[in-house]
Amino acid sequence: MYMAIMIILFLSSILLSLLLLLRKHLSHFSYPNLPPGNTGLPLIGESFSFLSAGRQGHPEKFITDRVRRFSSSSSCVFKTHLFGSPTAVVTGASGNKFLFTNENKLVVSWWPDSVNKIFPSSMQTSSKEEARKLRMLLSQFMKPEALRRYVGVMDEIAQRHFETEWANQDQVIVFPLTKKFTFSIACRSFLSMEDPARVRQLEEQFNTVAVGIFSIPIDLPGTRFNRAIKASRLLRKEVSAIVRQRKEELKAGKALEEHDILSHMLMNIGETKDEDLADKIIGLLIGGHDTASIVCTFVVNYLAEFPHVYQRVLQEQKEILKEKKEKEGLRWEDIEKMRYSWNVACEVMRIVPPLSGTFREAIDHFSFKGFYIPKGWKLYWSATATHMNPDYFPEPERFEPNRFEGSGPKPYTYVPFGGGPRMCPGKEYARLEILIFMHNLVNRFKWEKVFPNENKIVVDPLPIPDKGLPIRIFPQS
């Protein structure tokens, strides 16, 4: 009898919890005049559909299917439920403009719980003032005049990378190599770290963290999220030690403010816990190499698919080489001449945006396109929604770098770096390392895809070729 009562109480508590969850879930969508759409299951919402679309090789499908069902050219907004939050997805140039121009007025940046649990203090700083100061510091460090001194360093790293990782190889898998290249540059630029063994050790932990950042936040042994949390603790310990050492070097006058971004931050950000600063550096390292490595990978892919584009890039880079003495490295003036090469990289980012989109949080109630968006709701904007829209880019499936000649795309249609106050501060940094990669690549090699008809892209959480892009390489004559 006692056991039966306990079982009934246990089952009743579970049922009550489920009913409360359902009530909370439904309460999010009880407001009048909300955008049309589906909310999915309680708590889970449509998160699995959102993630699985990318993992199945059709990252755009989640957005396009719902735009077709729920939106029109005039509304361009639908509701869903992602990562535990009611969410309005805005699409189109007008949606991008609305979010980017209302940053810190109606919306603020927001990250899923998985990000905040892995990086408690890096992605969301403790105050708006701290966030503003950090962005200002990054902008100062990443502006063109400040980056000039890194051209030679990046070029040297690129030459060494292609000599040790690509030369004398018949076949390579591109994506792991581009990650290695951009991570080496990030370690050198942000931490002045050059020891290959130490860089390799950090890279392994970073890769584990990057895979788990946008996973379902279930902290059970063996899950991506669990592995990412463990790896982030090891990274935090390692980078905190570097921070402490650099503080001592700055006190002793053994390091300069312009030495790297860590010194720059220590000299300007004020008193900060080593662990908090380590989280910020880790976040920057991930942002500073993951997205650029994706662009470099797909540059290799599209240059293999379109020989006439490869030839124009090669011609442009050969012209730069002709003006240089033997073994003379690249300079900032050379980067400025790589106009067609950058058009190619821009077209790559249009078709395969390295970041599909990001979230915002409504900090007040407001109306968009005639629909009510409650305070506390999350908003998601998608780069693909405009990049692959024929109204903005005719024949969007066609690879055409000349789209970026002259004045280029219309405002708010091409957004690989976001926009508004939250636009990626590392845009010029990314341009620099991508162009230096292209320069060294085409001047040394020709290549062909091992699987010429394999174009599947998996977004997990960032877009990568399904097989990592294996290619056969040949020395440039």
Swiss-Prot record:
Coiled coil location: none
CDD domains assigned: CYP90-like
UniProt cofactor(s): heme
Chief subcellular location: membrane
GO biological process annotation, one example: triterpenoid metabolic process
Subcellular location: Membrane
EC numbers for this chain: 1.14.-.-
GO molecular function: heme binding; iron ion binding; oxidoreductase activity, acting on paired donors, with incorporation or reduction of molecular oxygen, NAD(P)H as one donor, and incorporation of one atom of oxygen
Keywords: Heme, Iron, Membrane, Metal-binding, Monooxygenase, Oxidoreductase, Transmembrane, Transmembrane helix
Binding residue positions for heme: 424
Top-rank EC class of the record's enzyme: oxidoreductase
GO cellular component, as recorded: membrane
Transmembrane segments: 2-22
Cystine pairings recorded for this chain: none
Function in brief: Possesses triterpene oxidizing activity. Catalyzes the C28 hydroxylation of alpha-amyrin, beta-amyrin, and lupeol, producing uvaol, erythrodiol, and betulin, respectively. Catalyzes the C28 carboxylation of alpha- and beta-amyrin.
Family recorded in the similarity comment: Belongs to the cytochrome P450 family.
Name this protein carries in UniProt: Cytochrome P450 716A1
Native species: Arabidopsis thaliana
Gene transcribed to yield this protein: CYP716A1
